Amino acid sequence: MSKERLLKVLLAPHVSEKSALLADASEQYIFKVVPNATKPEVKQAVESLFDVKVQSVNMINIKGKTKVFKGRVGKRNGLRKAIVRLAPGQEIDFVGAE
C-alpha cells in the first residue's frame, strides 16, 4: 500500500467525552476515516503514523441525518469511524504529535 494512501485514510481523531473515556479505560482510540477505508488500511496507517502496535480495528458506518430547512428536505453527510485498540502499554499522545 502506498504511503500517500496511508496518509489519506485517517481524516481526524474523533474527540468526544465517550472517546476520551475509551482512551483512558481501555486503550481504544476513535478516528474519522474515508468512506472506502478497510480495517487493514486503518491498522497500517495508525501503526506507521503513530509508531504503535495495533491489536484490533472495528469500523462503524453512521448514516447522515435527514433535516428540514425552510420547508426543504435535505440530508447531512454520513460518516465512517474506526475504533482502534492498541496493544497493552501503548498510547497515542495527540497533543505532542506533529
Swiss-Prot record:
<keyword id="KW-0699">rRNA-binding</keyword>
<dbReference type="GO" id="GO:0019843">
    <property type="term" value="F:rRNA binding"/>
</dbReference>
<dbReference type="GO" id="GO:0003735">
    <property type="term" value="F:structural constituent of ribosome"/>
</dbReference>
<dbReference type="InterPro" id="IPR012677">
    <property type="entry name" value="Nucleotide-bd_a/b_plait_sf"/>
</dbReference>
<dbReference type="Pfam" id="PF00276">
    <property type="entry name" value="Ribosomal_L23"/>
</dbReference>
<comment type="similarity">
    <text>Belongs to the universal ribosomal protein uL23 family.</text>
</comment>
<dbReference type="InterPro" id="IPR001014">
    <property type="entry name" value="Ribosomal_uL23_CS"/>
</dbReference>
<dbReference type="GO" id="GO:1990904">
    <property type="term" value="C:ribonucleoprotein complex"/>
</dbReference>
<keyword id="KW-0687">Ribonucleoprotein</keyword>
<comment type="subunit">
    <text>Part of the 50S ribosomal subunit. Contacts protein L29, and trigger factor when it is bound to the ribosome.</text>
</comment>
<keyword id="KW-0694">RNA-binding</keyword>
<comment type="function">
    <text>One of the early assembly proteins it binds 23S rRNA. One of the proteins that surrounds the polypeptide exit tunnel on the outside of the ribosome. Forms the main docking site for trigger factor binding to the ribosome.</text>
</comment>
<dbReference type="InterPro" id="IPR013025">
    <property type="entry name" value="Ribosomal_uL23-like"/>
</dbReference>
<dbReference type="InterPro" id="IPR012678">
    <property type="entry name" value="Ribosomal_uL23/eL15/eS24_sf"/>
</dbReference>
<dbReference type="GO" id="GO:0006412">
    <property type="term" value="P:translation"/>
</dbReference>
<dbReference type="GO" id="GO:0005840">
    <property type="term" value="C:ribosome"/>
</dbReference>
<keyword id="KW-0689">Ribosomal protein</keyword>
<protein>
    <recommendedName>
        <fullName>Large ribosomal subunit protein uL23</fullName>
    </recommendedName>
</protein>
